[in-house]
A protein has these predicted regions:
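The canonical Cys-X-X-Cys-His
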Residues: 40-50, 103, 107
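Axial heme c-ligation environment in periplasmic c-type cytochrome domains
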Residues: 55-56, 78-115
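Post-signal peptide N-terminal segment of mature Sec-exported envelope proteins
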Residues: 19-43
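Sec-dependent signal peptide recognition
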Residues: 1-4
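Gly/Gly-Pro-rich "capping" loops immediately C-terminal to redox-active cysteine motifs
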Residues: 49-77
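Bacterial signal peptide processing site
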Residues: 11-15
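Extracytoplasmic/secreted proteins, especially bacterial periplasmic and envelope-associated proteins
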Residues: 35, 39, 63, 74, ...
């Protein structure tokens, strides 16, 4: 879903590259709210847990910092309307703006998981 919000800074020079361990953490992370977790798994996980997708990885804070500086209203608009590689609504047609904001917050935070 937020895969597109993601592409914009992931390719920027100077940002650290995600590692296979970062990718494994992204694959394992899930929101604690069950409904949000379902939406994340259905709409966000495929792109945001794959280095190959060029979307910012869930939990890989370095790629999210640049985006977060734009402010949540801008990020939500990018998800809702589509932006660069991010498809409109991020494949989550039943997501509200509040869902998008909660998903962005979840994906932009570090997640600890066992590898």
């Amino acid at each position: 879903m937020l895969a597109a919000v993601l592409v914009l800074a992931a390719c920027s020079k100077g940002l650290p590259e995600a590692s296979p361990a970062d990718e494994r953490r992204a694959e394992a992370a899930r929101p604690t709210d069950a409904l949000l977790a379902q939406k994340y798994e259905r709409a966000c996980l495929t792109c945001h847990a794959s280095i190959a997708s060029k979307a910012p990885l869930t939990g890989f804070v370095a790629h999210w910092q640049v985006r977060l500086q734009q402010g949540m209203p801008t990020l939500v608009a990018h998800v809702r309307d589509g932006f660069q590689g991010m498809p409109a609504r991020g494949f989550c047609n039943d997501c509200s703006d509040q869902d998008f904001a909660a998903l962005i917050v979840f994906m932009s935070q570090p997640h600890n998981s066992k590898e």
